[in-house]
Each structure stands twice: as structure tokens, then as C-alpha cells.
């Protein structure tokens, strides 16, 4: 039986996680691992924070804190974000642990012992102004390969080519902005040329790798592999484990020790589980039964497919007591491309990004997981668009998937008292339904196994589409009046489809999957197979599975989150889709009266003079001549007293009621946004005032034949009502 060691790239503990990170290395891995677990495979899924190197020291320098304070804070922040996004790591560790120091130093010493390291004196970037050697990331300049400006001295973010500070054109200090000099400094280098041929043969034999990964790696090897430094002039990191004055006070380069974190985190995890020695079967070639799979973004391809395998080769055989084995080289490295935002690359410095922890404050995790999977940059860069996000959630999740599940559960409760009925004789469409169930399981599994997550999700949604079409064709609302056996068969088959959807959705939308399991009242463990719900099984009442995303939701998210990081980014997003007046209205409504000043401050930061001109215009309007309403216009309103005789939840909106109001000579149906302020019992039999001659209007699909009158001070809503009982239909004058 194959076992799997699955990793996601170690995120730097110097900032939060954005949607590009999630779509690149974490969500794909989680989908894959959840599928393996449903299949009953043996799998360990780990990641952890990368807590050394210049990104951490640079952040600490900017914030006036110690590196330890930075990594402790962001380790917890990132870990919590992944938990909220339902990324199901078996263990999320960190590299600032003794076990990681020990194993990393062991790798260094073994490579030195095997003559794969060389000590050299080389020119290192130095800032005369700040009186310090500069790590590569502290140096910026123009990339010599593509001409992109303001690129760091370790890698070009535009073309992806690794760099050294000496290669940069016009290099300067990223702290003070002054030109840099270069001074002699002794460091240890790994002789990458020792592994060139072996790496080339190994990569060429990986026929199952993604073309973008394989081609990138072979291109690098063809260019020639050179010696690369694996120690740095830094005071934060893992000390070089040698009694050598030349490297005293220096540390292991983070790009050397970070991937070793996959091993140290696994060791720490299994030690905590009481299985201290089991790490060997996941990282050593003991029986050929383990597949090591690294999920990464494309910027990490060279480090995982060239340098990391070279480090494993440089170590040689692992020997301990009765164990002697080679390290396992990666079985697969399914790297994803980049995610953009509204047609432009993510930029954390300009806050042109979707920060995951903020997005999850505004929308359910399943919504983010669904959309990122639907647009996953598997073979080319893809684009996050708020308009597309809204469309996909509303049309695909709500109208397709959620609608089908709700229909099936509603009918079994309405016509069979919540009990799964016996099937009668199957017709051709019934038989096709069972074929579709089996095909969906088989084909979705095959797509996930080959990392085609976007297609796999589409295949799941095709089963939901089939379910709706099946339901429409069989017309159970019609057969319920004339053929109960036919209705029972339709409902039974529909519920079988719902159950399989609950299984198929587990890798993609774990919360929705769990809710379907709850609504079906199932206690069995989910497995990647079709096991029927038996007739006679009782299910729960239908509940709304997904709520629609509104323009108001998106406006509030941009104003409340993106604008705080960079008002200019927020303005660009808002101007693309919305009128300024609409944004102001939504912001003031969502922030409420108590936070009005806060809302206005944010809006002013977004719109500047545009908002000030509008405010002056409104102030002049308010402070000048009062705009009177003519008596004749007022008399056009038909205000009448009524009594609420029925209150129901709106099926398509969680803040609205559908109420019936008795006006004496007729009963009107109204839609009212009172759920936050009144319970159903509070409203029932209450006298109210309505506008009776307001033109009917559909609100979320339900017609409202008038309007209830209420006072609203921004915090509370109070219905208007006569102070004593009067005849129903009495007119307000």
C-alpha cells in the first residue's frame, strides 16, 4: 500500500497569508489530502512557518521588534488563518525549534564530510550608512535578465530568475536607499555541479510531472549549475556548526535549511503522536512505498526541484543503529502559477491583495475555497475578480448546488414526513442517475489524483446540474397528486445524489459537506464510494445551504478591509464596479450610526476631494432652504392601519420576513427587514401602519405589496402603530 508524505511550502513568518498563497500551495494540497483520506490512504500532511532569514529580520527592523517577537506573532496568525480556511494539516510546525536546528546542522556537517561544500571568500553586499552586511533581500536594483526595476538580490519577482546582489544593476540598500559596496566575507558554498548529471537524469525520468515544472528545471540545469552560498552574515538563524573563526557568528542560509523543515516538522509531529521513529518510513527509502509530494507556487520550483534534491544527495545515506537508507527524492512537485487581482499582480506593499483572514471575516470559508478552486492557476496565471466571485457563488453554489439539496430535502419532509421512501420500479432516467453517481465518483477521483482540481470541481457541479434536471423532468410536485410511487422513487434517487454530493464536496467545501451530512442525519464516516441511504432512514428538515453574495457585501469588504491598508487600491476596485453614492450609502448603513465617523474617515481616505465636494453640496442643501412637500403630494400616500396575521422566514434572505397584513377588506403580503429587531412571535397580531398604494416590487424573489412604516435611528428599529385599537383598514390622515 502506498503512503503519502504531502507538504505545502513553508510560509515566511513575516506577514499574513493572501489568496495567492492559498491558491498556489495550500488549497490544492488540502483538496488532494482530503481525497486521499476519503480513500483510506495513509497520509501525513504538514507545513509550518519559515522563521529565519531576511524577511523576518527586515520586518523586525521596520517594526522595532525582535525577530523572535515577529515569528511568534505570525506563526500563530498564519496557523489560525489556515484553520479558518479549513486547511487540514496533520501538523503545522515551525523552524524555530531545537529539532530543526539539530537536523539542519546535521545536513550541513554531512555535506561537508562528503566533500560537497567549499569555503570561499567572496564579495558581500555592505551598507556603509547602516554599517552592516546586507542579506540578498536587503539589496534592490534592476534585474539583468529582464530589466525589471526594484528587484531584490535573491530573486526577480518578474521573471523568476534567482539573483545575487552582484548581478543587480545599480544595487542599493533596501533599508536606507543608499548605494552599496562589496566587502570580503568567508562563506561555505554547496558545489551544485557535483549533482548536475544525476539531477538531470532524475528530472528527465519524471514523466508524471507537470510540463511547466519539468521544463523550468531542465532549462536551469542546461544553463549550468554553479556553487551557491549556504551561510550568511546574519545574527538571526541557525548557527554554522563549526569551530571556525571565519564563520563565527554566521548562520545557515535560509534557503538551505528551510526545506529541511519538512523533515524536522514531520519528526516533531510524530514525536508528539508517540511514534518517534515512524518519520523514517516517510522520508527514507526503506521499502519504496512512500511518495513525497511538495505543493508549491511556481517561484519555488528551482528550490524544490533542483537545490532541495541536491541537499538530500549531498547528505548521502542516513545511518542510525540498524537503519541505513537513502533519502527519498520528491515523487512530484505540482507547482501552480500566479493568481492576479482584477488583472494586476498581487502587491503586498500596495495592499493590492486579498488577505485571507480579512476575507474570512466577511465571507464563509467555503466561498473562498470554491472560487479559488474554480479559477485555480494550475497551468497559467489566473485572475481574482469580485464580479466573477459574486456570479460564481450565486449562480453555481446557490442556484445550482444549494437549490438541488434544498429541493430534495424539502420534498422528503413535505410528502414523506422526513423519511426516505422505498423506491418503486426504475425508469431509464432513474438508472441513468445511478450511473451518473458512479461516474462522478470515478472521474472526480481521477482528476484530483492528477492535480486537475479545477476540472474535478466542475465534475462535481455537473452532478448537481444533473440532479436539478432529473428533478425537473420527474416533476415530483405533479406526480405527488397522481402517482405516489413515482414520487417516492424520485425523492429517493434525489437523496442518493445529495449524499454522494456530500462525499464529493468534502475535499473542496468541507463545511457544506458536513452540513449535508448533518441534514441527511448520517453518522457514518465519509468514504469515497457510493453507499445508499436506506429506505426508512429519517432526515432533518431542509435548511439553506448557501446565501447569495450581494454588491453590498463586496462594497463593505473593500471599504472595511482593503481601504484600511491602501485607500488608493480600494478606490480603483470600487470605481470599477460601483457609483460613489452607492458606496457611501452602503458604508454608512453597514457601519451604523455609532461608527459613522469611522466610516466617513475611511470614505474620505478613498475619495478625497470627490467626497468633500459631495459633503459640501449636501450640507448646503441641509442648511439652506427647507424643501417642503406639497400637501397634495402627501395626500397621494394611502397610509392604513393593518394587523399582522402571519410571519414566515424569507426563503432567499436571512434578514427578511414575509408577513401577511390584514387590512379588513383584504390581506396583503409584505417583505420586511425586521428579523434583526423582532421575533416572529413579537410581530404576530401586532397593529401596524403600511403604505397601501406603493407599487408592488419583488424583493429577493418574493413580491411585496406595500411597505411597513418604522422609525430607524441607526441602531434600533421601531414599528409605527396606533396607540389604541382601531378598525382594520382605517386611513392615516
From Swiss-Prot:
Q: Where does ATP bind?
A: 348
Which reaction(s) does its UniProt entry say it catalyses? tRNA(Met) + L-methionine + ATP = L-methionyl-tRNA(Met) + AMP + diphosphate
Q: Does the keyword Cytoplasm apply?
A: yes
Chain ranges for the short sequence motif 'HIGH' region as given in the UniProt record = 11-21
Motif annotated as 'KMSKS' region, chain positions: 345-349
Q: What residue range is the signal peptide?
A: none
The record's GO CC annotations read: cytosol
This entry's comment on the bound cofactor is:
Binds 1 zinc ion per subunit.
Q: Which residues form the tRNA-binding domain?
A: 633-733
Question: What terms describe the molecular function in GO for this protein?
Answer: ATP binding; metal ion binding; methionine-tRNA ligase activity; tRNA binding
Q: Where in the cell is it found?
A: Cytoplasm
| Cited Gene3D superfamilies | HUPs, Isoleucyl-tRNA Synthetase, Domain 1, Methionyl-tRNA synthetase, Zn-domain, Nucleic acid-binding proteins
Q: What is this protein called?
A: Methionine--tRNA ligase
- Cofactor requirements of the protein: Zn(2+)
Write the gene name.
Answer: metG
Q: Please name the top-level EC class of this enzyme.
A: ligase
Amino acid at each position: 500500500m502506498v503512503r503519502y508524505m504531502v507538504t505545502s511550502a513553508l510560509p515566511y513568518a513575516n506577514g499574513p497569508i493572501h489568496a495567492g498563497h492559498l491558491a498556489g500551495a495550500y488549497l490544492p494540497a488540502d483538496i488532494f489530502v482530503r481525497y486521499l483520506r476519503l480513500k483510506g490512504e495513509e497520509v501525513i500532511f504538514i507545513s509550518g512557518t519559515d522563521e529565519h532569514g531576511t524577511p523576518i529580520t527586515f520586518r523586525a527592523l521596520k517594526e522595532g521588534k525582535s525577530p523572535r517577537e515577529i515569528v511568534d506573532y505570525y506563526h500563530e496568525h498564519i496557523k489560525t488563518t489556515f484553520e479558518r480556511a479549513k486547511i487540514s494539516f496533520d501538523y503545522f510546525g515551525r523552524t524555530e525549534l531545537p529539532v530543526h536546528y539539530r537536523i539542519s546542522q546535521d545536513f550541513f556537517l554531512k555535506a561537508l564530510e562528503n566533500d560537497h561544500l567549499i569555503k570561499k571568500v567572496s564579495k558581500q553586499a555592505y551598507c556603509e550608512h547602516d554599517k552592516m552586511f546586507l542579506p540578498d533581500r536587503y539589496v534592490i536594483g534592476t534585474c539583468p535578465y529582464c530589466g525589471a526595476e526594484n528587484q531584490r538580490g535573491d530573486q526577480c519577482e518578474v521573471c523568476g530568475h534567482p539573483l545575487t546582489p552582484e548581478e543587480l544593476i545599480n544595487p542599493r540598500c533596501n533599508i536606507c536607499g543608499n548605494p552599496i559596496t562589496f566587502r570580503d566575507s568567508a562563506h561555505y558554498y554547496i558545489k551544485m555541479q557535483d549533482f548536475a548529471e544525476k539531477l538531470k537524469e532524475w528530472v528527465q525520468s519524471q514523466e508524471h510531472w507537470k510540463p511547466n515544472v519539468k521544463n523550468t528545471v531542465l532549462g536551469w540545469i542546461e544553463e549550468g549549475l554553479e556553487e551557491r552560498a549556504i551561510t550568511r552574515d546574519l545574527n538571526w538563524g541557525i548557527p554554522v556548526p563549526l569551530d571556525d573563526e571565519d564563520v563565527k557568528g554566521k548562520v545557515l542560509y535560509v534557503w538551505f535549511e528551510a526545506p529541511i523543515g519538512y523533515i524536522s516538522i514531520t519528526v516533531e509531529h510524530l514525536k508528539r503522536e508517540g511514534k518517534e521513529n515512524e518519520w523514517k518510513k516517510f522520508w527514507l527509502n526503506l521499502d519504496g512505498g512512500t511518495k513525497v509530494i511538495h505543493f508549491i507556487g511556481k517561484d519555488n520550483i528551482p528550490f524544490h526541484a533542483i537545490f532541495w534534491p541536491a541537499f538530500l544527495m549531498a547528505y548521502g545515506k542516513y545511518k542510525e543503529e540498524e537503519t541505513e537508507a537513502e533519502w527519498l527524492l520528491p515523487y512530484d512537485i505540482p507547482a501552480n502559477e500566479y493568481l492576479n487581482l482584477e488583472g494586476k499582480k498581487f502587491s503586498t506593499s500596495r495592499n493590492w491583495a486579498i488577505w485571507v483572514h480579512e476575507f474570512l471575516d466577511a465571507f464563509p470559508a467555503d466561498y473562498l475555497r470554491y472560487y479559488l478552486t474554480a479559477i485555480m492557476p494550475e497551468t497559467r496565471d489566473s485572475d481574482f475578480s469580485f464580479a466573477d466571485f459574486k456570479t460564481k457563488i450565486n449562480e453555481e453554489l446557490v442556484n445550482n448546488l444549494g437549490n438541488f439539496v434544498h429541493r430534495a430535502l424539502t420534498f422528503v419532509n413535505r410528502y414523506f414526513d422526513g423519511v426516505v421512501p422505498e423506491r418503486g420500479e426504475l425508469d431509464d432516467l432513474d438508472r441513468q442517475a445511478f450511473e451518473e453517481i458512479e461516474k462522478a465518483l470515478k472521474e472526480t477521483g481521477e482528476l484530483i489524483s492528477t492535480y486537475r482540481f479545477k476540472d474535478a470541481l466542475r465534475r462535481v457541479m455537473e452532478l448537481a446540474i444533473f440532479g436539478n434536471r432529473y428533478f425537473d423532468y420527474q416533476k415530483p410536485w405533479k406526480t405527488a397528486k397522481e402517482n405516489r410511487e413515482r414520487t417516492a422513487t424520485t425523492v429517493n434517487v434525489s437523496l442518493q445524489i445529495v449524499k454522494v454530493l456530500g462525499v464529493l464536496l468534502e475535499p473542496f467545501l468541507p463545511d457544506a459537506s458536513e452540513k449535508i451530512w448533518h441534514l441527511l442525519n448520517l453518522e457514518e464516516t465519509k468514504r469515497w464510494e457510493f453507499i445508499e441511504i436506506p429506505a426508512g432512514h429519517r432526515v432533518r428538515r431542509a435548511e439553506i445551504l448557501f446565501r447569495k453574495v450581494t454588491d453590498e457585501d463586496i462594497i463593505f469588504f473593500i471599504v472595511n478591509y482593503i481601504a484600511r491598508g491602501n485607500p488608493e487600491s480600494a478606490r480603483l476596485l470600487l470605481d470599477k464596479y460601483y457609483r460613489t453614492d452607492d458606496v457611501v450609502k452602503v458604508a454608512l448603513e453597514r457601519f451604523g450610526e455609532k461608527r459613522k465617523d469611522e466610516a466617513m474617515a475611511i470614505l474620505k481616505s478613498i475619495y478625497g476631494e470627490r467626497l468633500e465636494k459631495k459633503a459640501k453640496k449636501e450640507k448646503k442643501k441641509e442648511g439652506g432652504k427647507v424643501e417642503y412637500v406639497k400637501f397634495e403630494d402627501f395626500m397621494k400616500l394611502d397610509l392604513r392601519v393593518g394587523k399582522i396575521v402571519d410571519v414566515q422566514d424569507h426563503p432567499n434572505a436571512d434578514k427578511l420576513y414575509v408577513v401577511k397584513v390584514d387590512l379588513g377588506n383584504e390581506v396583503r403580503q409584505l417583505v420586511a427587514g425586521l428579523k434583526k429587531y423582532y421575533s416572529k412571535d413579537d410581530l404576530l397580531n401586532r397593529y401596524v401602519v403600511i403604505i397601501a398604494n406603493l407599487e408592488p416590487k419583488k424583493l429577493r424573489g418574493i413580491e411585496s405589496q406595500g411597505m411597513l412604516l418604522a422609525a430607524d435611528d441607526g441602531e434600533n428599529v421601531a414599528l409605527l402603530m396606533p396607540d389604541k385599537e382601531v378598525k382594520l383598514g382605517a386611513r392615516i390622515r
